[in-house]
Curated annotation (Swiss-Prot):
An annotated Gene Ontology molecular function: structural constituent of ribosome
Organism: Pyrococcus abyssi (strain GE5 / Orsay)
Protein name in the entry: Large ribosomal subunit protein eL40
Taxonomic placement: Archaea, Methanobacteriati, Methanobacteriota, Thermococci, Thermococcales
Gene3D superfamilies assigned to the protein according to its UniProt record, in alphabetical order: 4.10.1060.50
Annotated S-S bridges: none
UniProt GO BP: translation
Amino acid sequence: MARFPEAEARIFKKYICLRCGATNPWGAEKCRKCGYKRLRPKAREPRGGGR
């Protein structure tokens, strides 16, 4: 992962749409592609485990 704050801000200060998975800017109220209002912050740790 990123080791310094500038890189972490650039990589993780984004929202992901829960409907279509599009990446959106940090200040977004709704998805830029589908208009859905439910957005989650980009995960800082990987999900699952890959098994």
